[in-house]
């Protein structure tokens, strides 16, 4: 490829990456949708924001099989085409079941290409350029969350249908990927995958459980903040979108800081991540103003983005089965996300949590415990090294 072709290929891949983090962009629509569908239980309304995660993980399980049949590029194009249709369909949909179906399809489309983008980057770029492109991918994911959330938050002022115009970004992503990313031979990337999938890290089950717990309480924050702000009387659907926007900005900053902080702190970065998440939950729990909740959202994004790359790095370091281990972590992530509305309801009912503020105090307790546990583990390791 010429230099110009390389730039266009890289830009096209990164533009598709923008879509991967855009599903939660309509979280701020929850209060508006609850009014639009008064006969639908709130837990089902909240499921609209997390049902993409469930179908995303189903698609992740199928994506490698589909890629072997039709090729990597074609699989990505099919996935992006699905997001174009499913992302924009709610502009015209008035039926709640069809709206739920469109969100499920959107998640499925993202899942088809989400785990394949790293393979595509690894195929076209080597060495430092590969590392740099992977870093850009993380940044573009965060940028996508910021951009789509901001646009959706402004458009929801008109009506909830209009907010889905934010997904028009999927159209240029499809066109550019189709035009500027060369076709990839089927055999080569799949041979690498087969070699990488033979072993799993010994601690994989621990990583899966930890991921499930952290992402469950992280997602509870995302789905409950809009309802909290409206019910507490200090926010609207639009102001709630600023919190989701701040979360995306925090995630971008966390992603940019991760490499440098990890080099310095190693596994102690988890203490920083869980401390940030603790402070975020406290800020939201005590808040009676949009600005403080926005700060909570920003800290949530930083903490989450410091945690998740750590998990992916850990499973890639300990085993040769990078692809399989990464897929399992993504499945745990998305399963936790898709179940989070019902997990929140279960926690509220079983622990007799009467208010949403108290649910955030429970989140605080969970992240405090995790911070203390990993601080203790770090201290024990340091003590053993000193001996």
Q: What are these language model-derived features?
A:
Residues 86, 97-106, 291-299:
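Paired small-residue
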Residues 96, 102-141:
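Cytoplasmic helix-loop-helix junction between adjacent transmembrane helices
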């Amino acid at each position: 490829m010429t230099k110009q072709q390389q730039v266009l290929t890289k830009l096209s891949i990164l533009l598709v990456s923008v879509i991967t983090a855009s599903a939660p962009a309509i979280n701020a629509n929850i209060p508006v949708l609850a009014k639009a569908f008064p006969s639908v239980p709130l837990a089902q309304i909240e499921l609209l924001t997390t049902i993409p995660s469930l179908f995303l993980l189903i698609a992740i399980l199928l994506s490698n099989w589909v890629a072997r049949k039709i090729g990597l590029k074609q699989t990505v194009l099919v996935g992006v085409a699905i997001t174009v249709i499913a992302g924009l369909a709610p502009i015209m949909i008035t039926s709640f079941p069809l709206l739920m179906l469109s969100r499920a399809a959107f998640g499925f489309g993202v899942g088809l290409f989400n785990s394949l983008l790293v393979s595509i980057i690894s195929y076209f770029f080597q060495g430092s350029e590969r590392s740099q492109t992977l870093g850009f991918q993380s940044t573009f994911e965060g940028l996508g969350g910021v951009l789509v959330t901001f646009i959706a938050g402004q458009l929801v002022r008109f009506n909830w249908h209009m907010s889905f115009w934010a997904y028009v970004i999927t159209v240029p992503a499809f066109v550019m990927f189709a035009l500027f990313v060369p076709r990839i031979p089927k055999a080569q990337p799949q041979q690498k995958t087969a070699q990488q999938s033979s072993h799993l890290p010994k601690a994989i089950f621990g990583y899966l459980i930890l991921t499930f717990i952290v992402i469950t309480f992280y997602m509870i924050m995302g789905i409950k903040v809009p309802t909290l702000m409206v019910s507490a009387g200090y926010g609207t659907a639009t102001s709630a979108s600023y919190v989701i926007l701040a979360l995306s900005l925090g995630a971008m900053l966390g992603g940019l800081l991760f490499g440098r902080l990890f080099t310095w702190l190693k596994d102690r970065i988890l203490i920083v991540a869980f401390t940030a998440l603790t402070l975020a939950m406290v800020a939201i729990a005590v808040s009676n103003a949009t600005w403080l909740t926005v700060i909570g959202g920003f800290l949530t994004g930083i903490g989450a983005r410091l945690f998740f790359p750590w998990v992916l790095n850990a499973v890639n370091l300990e085993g040769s089965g990078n692809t399989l281990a990464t897929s399992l972590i993504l499945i745990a992530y998305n399963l936790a996300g898709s179940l989070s509305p019902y997990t929140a309801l279960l926690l509220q009912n079983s622990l007799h949590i009467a208010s949403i503020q108290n649910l955030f105090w429970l989140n605080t307790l969970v992240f405090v415990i995790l911070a203390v546990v990993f601080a203790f583990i770090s201290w024990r390791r340091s003590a053993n090294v000193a001996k």
